[in-house]
């Protein structure tokens, strides 16, 4: 598998390392506006290949993306402490459009994973600018949020996170929606499990949801960025593609019409295989969850409309 990574900040470089450790990249091209940084990362990773499977890793340009199976987009300005993901939009939208034009030119048949925040909006801009197949362009979405929530529940209830099944959908950010109505531990509905163990109540579950939502902010406040967990999440996504696992993951995908949400990239459960997104799964949400999901979609739609209006204004002024 040939993998291209655009953007070698902490997320991009950590993702390259995670992919090297997974061992399924025979070729990895690293692209960054700072070519020396990309070259440094490539050398550092190459020196680790005696301890992993052999891989050809090098710094390159967009033209080197030709023949890539997967392209990971992690380029963008970093999130500031206290800054929401949506506030990042204006600073990253133009960067994303430029990347989209180059990726579609040199690797039009690749599967593209957008990681840059705010991921839902930027995935939408990438898709629209590139004109690529919507099944092959998606964002990392709420994969990490889902993992965070499962971890919190597992730690509290004393189970492995792998035995906890719950999804976080909607925006990867402040308006994300935990789907409590479908939450299970080992096949037992979470509400029933809570009654058995008598450890959980609605306030505790609400606290889990809030901790999940605030996790990135807390990490950024302490160390400046989140990068290890998201790198592992992206490597996990690529693994599902490589092995054609058809796993169900909450990715930010383009929706034509999903529970009343149209023309938007937002996180919902999908099956992912070697050809990209194969199925979009429609959840049976309760009224409260459905309302929250549509509200989340509305927030993202408004953000897209605002930046589109700004872009049109800028073009008219410059023209």
Curated annotation (Swiss-Prot):
Organism: Thermotoga maritima (strain ATCC 43589 / DSM 3109 / JCM 10099 / NBRC 100826 / MSB8)
Keywords: Allosteric enzyme, Cytoplasm, NAD, Oxidoreductase, Phosphoprotein
Residues where beta-D-fructose 1,6-bisphosphate binds: 150, 165
Protein name stated in the entry: L-lactate dehydrogenase
pH profile: Optimum pH is 7.
Catalytically driven reaction(s): (S)-lactate + NAD(+) = pyruvate + NADH + H(+)
Listed GO CC annotations: cytoplasm
GO biological process: glycolytic process; lactate metabolic process; pyruvate metabolic process
């Amino acid at each position: 598998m040939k993998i291209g990574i655009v953007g070698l900040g902490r997320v991009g470089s950590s993702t390259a390392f995670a992919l090297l450790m997974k061992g399924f990249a025979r070729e990895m091209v690293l692209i960054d506006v700072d070519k020396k940084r990309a070259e440094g990362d490539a050398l550092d990773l190459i020196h680790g290949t005696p301890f992993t499977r052999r891989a050809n890793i090098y710094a390159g340009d967009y033209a080197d993306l030709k023949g890539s199976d997967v392209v990971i987009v992690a380029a963008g300005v970093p999130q500031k402490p206290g800054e929401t993901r949506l506030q990042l939009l204006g600073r990253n939208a133009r960067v994303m459009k430029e990347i989209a034009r180059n990726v579609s030119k040199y690797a039009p048949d690749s599967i593209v994973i957008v990681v840059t925040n705010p991921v839902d909006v930027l995935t939408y801009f990438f898709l629209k600018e590139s004109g690529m197949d919507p099944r092959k362009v998606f964002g990392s979405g709420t994969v990490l949020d889902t993992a965070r929530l499962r971890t919190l529940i597992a730690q509290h209830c004393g189970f492995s996170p792998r035995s906890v099944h719950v999804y976080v959908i909607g925006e990867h950010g402040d308006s994300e929606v935990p789907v409590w109505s479908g939450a299970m531990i080992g096949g037992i509905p979470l509400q029933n499990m809570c009654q058995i163990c008598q450890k959980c109540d609605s306030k505790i579950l609400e606290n889990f949801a809030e901790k999940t939502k605030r996790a990135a902010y807390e990490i950024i406040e302490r160390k400046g960025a989140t990068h290890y967990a998201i790198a592992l999440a992206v490597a996990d996504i690529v693994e599902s593609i490589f092995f054609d696992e058809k796993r169900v993951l909450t990715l930010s995908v383009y929706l034509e019409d999903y529970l009343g949400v149209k023309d938007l990239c937002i996180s919902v459960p999908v099956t992912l295989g070697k050809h990209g997104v194969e199925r979009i799964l429609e959840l049976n949400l309760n009224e409260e969850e459905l309302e929250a999901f549509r509200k989340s979609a509305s927030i993202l739609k408004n953000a897209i409309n605002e930046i589109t209006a700004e872009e049109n204004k800028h073009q008219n002024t410059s023209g």
